[in-house]
Amino acid sequence: MLKNKNKFYSLWLLLIISLVFVLQLLIPKFTDFFLLNGSALTNFQYWRFLTAIFLHGSLTHLLFNLFALFFFGIILEKEIGSKNFLLVFFFSGILANLIAVNFYESSLGASGAIYGIIGMLTVIKPLMMVWTFGMIMPMFIASIIWITADVLRTLGAFGTTNIGSIAHLSGIAIGILLGFLFRGFVKR
């Protein structure tokens, strides 16, 4: 069993991400210093793979991620425990950023980490009912829809967007893999 005492790290992450957004608004060049871009590798600025997770490009971007982290993060943290939740969050987020930096000029946001949470929940709680696109559906169906939308977006079906679909797809793939690796240890 993967559980350990719940310390509500998902709620602390919500607070930290929100505070970082306030700093982005108040401090000129704050975002530029922590943003993930090509210089992260060429200039040995490896902290950017982590710090970019806490940055957001707009209030809408922030609110979508906070909403998803609140609902999915709390559920996963209760299922696998706080320490394991943090491992999934940071492992998915950093690895998704390592992949995304090869496709985008710059990248920011917690989406890769959150999609990792979603991916793991898809494996360990596939029939959990979630509300998305105005409907209630099983988690695995919602994930198929989200994956399909991101694949189509990556292929340009929706025109040019600022959405990091590669980070989304990488995060959910990592979360699904982690879910299969550890699902035998998760209490059902």
Kindly give the residue locations of the regions a language model identified:
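A detector for small-residue-rich transmembrane helices and their helix-helix packing motifs
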Residues: M1-R188
